Design a protein with these regions (language model features):
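Nucleotide-activated donor-binding/catalytic signature segment of Leloir-type glycosyltransferases, i.e.
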Residues: 92-104, 109-134
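Carbohydrate-associated surface elements
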Residues: 22, 41-44
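Nucleotide-sugar-dependent
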Residues: 75, 131-137, 145-164, 174-185
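Short acidic alpha-helix that forms the nucleotide-activated donor recognition element
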Residues: 8-11, 113, 131-142, 168
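Nucleotide-sugar donor phosphate/pyrophosphate-binding loop at the beta->alpha transition
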Residues: 1-8, 47
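A short, active-site helix/loop in glycosyltransferases that binds the activated sugar's phosphate group
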Residues: 7-37, 184
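Conserved donor-binding/catalytic core segment of Leloir-type glycosyltransferases
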Residues: 57-75, 81-82
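Acidic anion/phosphate-binding donor-loop and adjacent secondary structure
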Residues: 28-29, 44-61
Length: 186
């Protein structure tokens, strides 16, 4: 159904703009006419969103890992938490020294299930929905930012727009993304 809608839209447009070269290359492969009538313009961030915010890490004794946005279906914490479990069991990370913040629409019951499964009770905090500015402040209040692109067909062709806000926040980014794809290239 999505492919049909996509074809309807692209058949009617005069010029095609995508936000990644990977996506553009796929359009050109499917419809060669786009080679001469298309371009890729990457997403970015709005500098105004960062003005007046305090660029300061959490100031706690915890190492704060933050994910902003929605987790659902194949975009989930499983790979990250499996890796963290290995690091904790190998004594590379002290469970007591970390806090995982899920900023956005992540149901508390989902976070509780992860906490129980990975023995991280009290370590996974949810904030619920936050306005955009407060969400960006949470980036500044973090030690590392978690970016997850789910394992779905075509995931290598796109990235989340938040990647540019993550980079602008000047924190390390732990990216669980398709190798060689658009998000990995950024």
């Amino acid at each position: 159904m999505e492919r049909k809608q996509e074809a309807q839209v692209t058949n009617e447009c005069d010029f095609l703009i995508t936000n990644s070269k990977f996506m553009l290359e796929n359009f050109i492969k499917d419809t060669p006419k786009w080679k001469e009538h298309s371009t890729a313009i990457p997403n970015g961030y709005d500098e105004e969103d960062f003005k007046g915010l305090i660029n300061q890490r959490n100031g706690q004794d915890k190492f704060v890992i933050t994910h902003t946005g929605t987790l659902y279906g194949k975009r989930n914490l499983t790979e990250f938490l499996e890796g963290l479990k290995i690091a904790i069991e190998g004594n590379h990370v002290n469970r007591e020294d970390i806090e995982i913040r899920l900023v956005g629409n992540v149901h508390e019951s989902v976070a509780a299930e992860y906490a129980e499964k990975y023995n991280l009770q009290g370590k996974i905090k949810t904030t619920g929905y936050m306005n955009h500015r407060d969400s960006i402040q949470m980036l500044y209040n973090s030690d590392i930012l978690l970016l997850i692109i789910g394992k779905v067909k075509g995931a290598e062709n796109f990235y989340s727009g938040k990647i540019f806000e993550y980079i602008r926040a000047d924190r390390p980014v732990l990216a669980i993304v398709p190798e060689g794809g658009a998000a990995a290239e950024v």
